[in-house]
Structure formats: C-alpha cells, structure tokens
Amino acid sequence: MNKNLKEAPNFNEADVQLREKIRKQGLSLGFDWVGFTSASKNLTHSSYLAWLEEGFAGEMNYLQKHAAQKTSSQNVLESAQTVISVACNYFHDDTPTLKFQDSSRGRFSRYSVGDDYHLVLKERLKEFRNWLLSEGLASGFEQTRVYVDTGPLLERELAWRAGFGWFGKHSNLIHPKLGSWLLLAEVLIDSKIPPDQPFSGIDCGSCTRCIEACPTGAIVSDRQVDARRCLSYLTIELKNTIPKQYRSKLQNWIFGCDICQEVCPWNRKAPKSSDSTWKARNGLRDRKLWDWVRLEQEEFSNQFRKSAVKRTKRRGLLRNVVTALSACSHPQALSGLLIGLRDEEELVRKHSAWALGFRRQRITKSILWRHLRVETTEQVIIEIQEALASKLKHSIKRERACLLTRQVSLALARKHRLGPSGGNHRRSSHNRRTKLLQD
C-alpha cells in the first residue's frame, strides 16, 4: 500500500490518476458508475433520525437498531478513510411494468424481476475488493468492508457526496444521464483516495409528477416518504395485514411499486442495461393474477430461487395477489379469490375475504356466507363479517338510490301527463269553462 497516499492531507496528480485507475477497474467489473468520498461524518444523519422519530419507517425496526452507527462510515470500520460508492443500472426493455396496464397481470418492481441484486452486487464487490487488496490499496482484508443495501450506512448521502446526482422529490437519487433505475453499493478501504465533488447544479425544479402520481400519498413532503403508505413497503416489508385504506390502491402491483420513477421525466431517456442479470425471469410476464394464487410452496421456491421476491415468502406474495384481484375486472378473478379463500395461510384467506367483499358482484355475498360456516380462524371470521356488513351497507344504499330514482321518475312522469304547469293547468282550464257557461 502507498503509505504516503494514506497519510497525505492533500492530493497530487498521481493520486488523481490512481483514483481514475480504480474507477476504471470498477466499471470493468460491471458497475455503471463509480464515485469516491471520504469516510467522514454524515451530513443527513439528523434528518434521518427525525424521519425515524416521525414513525415513517413503519415496522422496519432494523433501521432504528443501527441508527446511531450511521453518523459516520467509520463506525462500521474505524480505520476507513475512503468510501467507494458504486451503482448498477437495472433498466431493461422487457421489464413488466409500464407494459402491464392490464389489470389481470401482476406487476413487479423492475429491480426484482431478475436475480437478487444483493447476491449479484456482493460478488462484484468482493472481486473489486480483492483487486484493491492486490494493488495495496488496503492494509489487509480486515481493513475493508463491502455493503449492498443492508449495512449501517447512509448510502444515498454517500453516493451524492461522491458526485452521483441529486435527491429527487420521491427521495430516490437521480443521475443526470442514467436516471434513477440504479442500485447502490459500497466498498470501504483504509486508504485516502481523492474524493469526487458532491453533485450540484441540477434538481427537480418545480416538477411534482411523482408526488401527484403516488396512489397513497406516500410522498408527504419534498424528498420525504412515509413508508407506511408506500406500496413497496406494504407489499414487501409489511409482513402481516395491509391496512384497509390502502388495499384498493395496490391496483395490480404484487411486489413493490415503480410509479414515482415511471412518471419521472429524467427516466424518459434512461439508458437500457446490457446486463442480462437484470432481465425478467420466465414466468413473470404472462402469468395471470388468478394463476399466481395457485402457486404452491415448492413452485414458489423454484420460481424465485436467488430472487429478491423470496423476501415476502409465499404468504406475502399471495396476500398481495388476492388483494390485487379485488380490482381485476376479468371473470376469472372470482375463481382466483375462491382459491385464496381456501388457502392454508390465514393471511391469504383474510385478504381474499376482503377482496370478495370489495367486489360488487351479488354472488360474492353467498360465497362469503358459505365460507363463514366452515372458517375456524377468528381473524378471518371477523374479516368475512366485516365484508358482509359492507355489502349490506352498500345494498341498503343501492336500494335507497333505486327508490329515489323511482320517485323522481314517477314525479317526472306525472309532470309530463299534467303538462308544463302541472296541476295549475287543470284548474285554469276548469275556470275557463265555468266562465264561458256564465256568459
């Protein structure tokens, strides 16, 4: 290792050339962007703590657990001097997102349709670290760390400080040329490498498309997201029941959500990745929602082997599927919910019952009544009862509306028979006849 490089407070041309050599190596390993920043105190830590204090993290308790460590990268590696921030573009033409406006098909976030990025990037980072060690750019293996999304680091700040781009109003980082379809990762080393300049000069301006497009209003303020409302959190991180006020907002998203990125103008010209790792797996593009409900555990494990989708487990994915079926207009949707209502998982049955109650088909009422007789789990029974109560309430409203419509129709018909002046027309005619007789 170059000891002078590690200890020097200033950098010379040779140091800059070394940085560019490292950057070139990172790009050759499959990263689409490589940047450098110092392992100093983080600038956004107080904002991060305030976000946690607001409860915006929902049930992601692991974020609170490591919050104190995130004040500085040196809390995870005391000897760290430099953070090498890297990013991979995962945007592919065949990703089933915007093409899947068809409500009968389940939609997955772009990042999840290929191989699990945690595994892919971790292998590339290890290769990068081995090269850095071979070049003497770290004192030893123990003086390095590699992280992909899971470490106690403020990844977006590190990437911003390393010159990546700016914080979009949806809170994702936006690169001026690559857009926001990128995955971040880091290598920490104990050598001082000249840092890149933090990004500046461009931001979102007056654009609010992501804020307006979010179906649940999860973007509560500029660059701040309430995860408890976010469809990605609700379909992935939340392990149990989805709050009722958000269920109908899922549309046909069954793993994650990309709406805020899809509407972003900076992603219109985002380059497409040539890396086949991120291509959609077979079976994701054409499978209908009601076919996903038939997914058994063995098939789930095979379909999503080394995939980020495994995070939800089968029960979580099927919970999302039956919830999405509530808004599917295809006749087969009902058959899918019937299967969901008989699933072994309480969570799936519970959301199937809600979805049947949400659908305005008369047959769903009798289906719920029949299942109520055989259901043994209290939470599912309560869900069925609430679904039936909702249907009764809707039925009463419908009957009242029909009665009101009938009354209006009768009134209009009566007015039509009596003429434009109604009953007064009949009385005035009688008065005219009486006057003629008197004359």
Show the residue positions of the predicted features.
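C-terminal amphipathic alpha-helical segment
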Residues: Y246-W278, E299-K310, G316-T323
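Short, intrinsically disordered C-terminal tails of secreted or membrane-associated proteins
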Residues: T434-K435
